[in-house]
Amino acid sequence: MAVGIVGWGAYIPRYRIKTREIAEAWGDDALRIRDMYLVEEKAVGYIDEDPVTMAVEASRDALIRAGVKPSEVGAVFAGTESKPYAVKPISSILIDALGLNRQVYSVDMEFACKAGSDAIINLMGLVKANSIKYGIAVGTDSSQGEPGEHLEYTVGTGAVAYVIGSSNLAAEIKYTYPYASDTPDFWRRDSSPYPVHGEGFTGEPAYFKHIIGAAKGLMDELGMKPNDFDYAVFHQPNARFPVRVAQMLGFPLEKVKPGIVVDLIGNTYNASALLGLAKVLEEAKPGAKIIVVTFGSGAGSNAFYIETTDQLPGKVKLARTIGEMLEDKVYIDYSLYLKYRKIIKMIHG
């Protein structure tokens, strides 16, 4: 049974802040910051936007592109690390917001930035087992960075959703490969508002080791090489890391660049690589071969081998594209950024 992507949707907030604006507020060298991360600006959710509202918007567009009725959806899984509620799932809110039946599997998944891709893999299993006809996988985050800390320059906001099924496929997911270990590169304790990163652990032992392990494992099992793929999409904590890991694996820049979005919206965590995939789907031709590798701190990666179908081109314009959302933007200054992020609040009386 062929299983894969029936439809997809995304949501990127309109509000953006230049990394230069943040650097000037803290007295940092804006050019040095830009050269370090290659992130020009990032998306910022408005006061009434959060991972739930973004997940709803992305899922609605995914259903439109899929041509699937809400009543046909048998499961909804949401991957996030920034839930608005400590105890209350996003997935159950999506059931009512999208008009799904009550008889659906629903769960919020957690593994740092790769839970959204875990949601896809779990839905694939349910479809293959004939337990459901279609499922919705969501990656959504409003990423947190402590003011004045370097993470603030790269964390962004956004969501992406994929309808997974076995009919009317825009792209078939032909193979997946996992790679995981106990690596303390990045964490946030329950009582802390902001995460902590393990400095030297964030690069070689975490991001690069796991993405390379998953990508090489997938290619070795399939007997494929970098030149067999038309596109390569990797998790994007900044714009340097995906280009560097591509070079380490042997992928040329022209196969990686189409899927990079972090330079314009920041690292959207669970939506990061999956937004990159959505952008690639907007330009890929039928028969295109795509490798996607997600990454979540702690640490683990999922590698996907995806091949597009003849139905892909007809689905692209059915909903707003990543390209359109990247262009639809309003810039804000740092004071509004702090307000929209609820870092500063008005105290009454």
UniProtKB/Swiss-Prot annotation:
Keywords: Acyltransferase, Isoprene biosynthesis, Transferase. Its EC number is 2.3.3.10. CoA binds at residue 240. (3S)-3-hydroxy-3-methylglutaryl-CoA binds at residues 29-30, 113, 154, 202, 235, 244, 267, 297. The active site is at residues 81, 113, 235. GO terms for biological process: farnesyl diphosphate biosynthetic process, mevalonate pathway; isopentenyl diphosphate biosynthetic process, mevalonate pathway. Pfam families: ACP_syn_III_C, Thiolase_N. One of its GO terms (molecular function) is hydroxymethylglutaryl-CoA synthase activity. Pathway: Metabolic intermediate biosynthesis; (R)-mevalonate biosynthesis; (R)-mevalonate from acetyl-CoA: step 2/3. It catalyses: acetoacetyl-CoA + acetyl-CoA + H2O = (3S)-3-hydroxy-3-methylglutaryl-CoA + CoA + H(+). InterPro entries: ACP_syn_III_C, HMG_CoA_Synthase, Thiolase-like, Thiolase_N. Interacts with acetoacetyl-CoA thiolase that catalyzes the precedent step in the pathway and with a DUF35 protein. The acetoacetyl-CoA thiolase/HMG-CoA synthase complex channels the intermediate via a fused CoA-binding site, which allows for efficient coupling of the endergonic thiolase reaction with the exergonic HMGCS reaction. Catalyzes the condensation of acetyl-CoA with acetoacetyl-CoA to form 3-hydroxy-3-methylglutaryl-CoA (HMG-CoA). Functions in the mevalonate (MVA) pathway leading to isopentenyl diphosphate (IPP), a key precursor for the biosynthesis of isoprenoid compounds that are building blocks of archaeal membrane lipids. Belongs to the thiolase-like superfamily. Archaeal HMG-CoA synthase family. This is Hydroxymethylglutaryl-CoA synthase.
